Amino acid sequence: MSNNYIHPDSIIGKDTTLEPFSYIDADVEIGNNCWIGNNVTIYSGARIGDNVRIFPGAVISSIPQDLKFGGEKTTVTIGNNSTIREYVTISRGTEDKMTTSIGENCLIMAYSHIAHDCIIGLSLIHI
């Protein structure tokens, strides 16, 4: 018994580890060799690259904190080799086909919030 919820329409890459009590929604893509810590929530629209580490309590691709959001199909992308530390929240884009993007080789430090429609470049540290 895994104690995880993994929607059958999600895509999880080879050699990716999901620790207990994580939630993976529909329309989620997680790359190869990732590590998803316990109590991580990944909502619809997440596109996660290879070799990404997401630490306990993080919430990825939550609906944006924007009153004009009307349920459009939007995404969050996290580039290869990035690390998302404990209790980070990342909101997806606001308008149709918009995205919140974190580049490759980034470190998003604990308790950070990445708001809707933000673009974080390559190899950056967000405090």
Regions found by a protein language model. Name each.
Residues 67-70, 91:
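Active-site beta->alpha loop and helix N-cap motifs at the rims of alpha/beta catalytic domains
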Residues 125-127:
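Conserved small/polar residues in nucleotide/adenosyl-binding loops
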Residues 2, 7-8, 13-14, 19-20, ...:
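Left-handed beta-helix
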